[in-house]
Amino acid sequence: LVPVKRSHSVCAQGGINSVNDTTRAQGDNEWKHFDDTVYGGDFLNHQPPVKEMCDAGPKVIDLLDRLGVPFNRTSEGRLDRRRFGGTLYKRTAFAGATTGQQLLYALDEQARRWEAEGLIKLYEHWEFLGLVLDDAGVCRGCVIQDMFSMEIRALKADAVVMATGGCGLIFGKSTMSMICTGGANSRVYQESVKYANGEFIQVHTTAIPGADKLRLM
């Protein structure tokens, strides 16, 4: 609906966690990263993909570094790390206070390179209207609308992957972008798609009003 570089990911500041050479020398490993993550999630996490994420983390950060994400570095030129989010070790790779923005820009650049090579087609400024279901309820594509010309088009597909991002505006108070409405989530839910794990939708507590101003940032 909006340019990729205006999506809410540009507001993410923290960083990405993974085991690294420095933490390994201190006794860290992927199982400890896994334990930190599951414990931090109050044991609600589906654990197999958490372990896969911890195993893949070092390679993912290395790939992003090679794609041009300007991670902070030490005076020796190595990736700088910090502790973040209750971790036991300094696992977090970060790009100043704009990690989300830098990741988004690097990945957007790769997507546009793939489009230039004819490998993918980007539909920017198009809004998702709904799924195309056959009589058996099997998804066969989706319907989208050009928000400039108002043209409506149906796209045929073997599979439709929903990656809609956050939907924080379903709460009365939220610090999320005005585009995080959850509209796409609602449309597919109304078309019989199962919705689960709603407790993992982030409620950014800095937006909760209180008598004490210390609660606000």
Features from the language model and the residues they span:
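Residues forming the flavin
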Residues: 1-32, 73, 97-217
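Glycine-rich active-site loop/strand segments that organize a redox cofactor
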Residues: 18-53
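A short alpha-helix capping/helix-coil boundary motif
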Residues: 37-41, 87, 161-166
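Helix-loop-beta segment of a Rossmann-like dinucleotide-binding subdomain
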Residues: 43-47, 80-105, 168-172
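A conserved beta-strand/loop capping segment in the N-terminal third of enzymes
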Residues: 52-89, 211
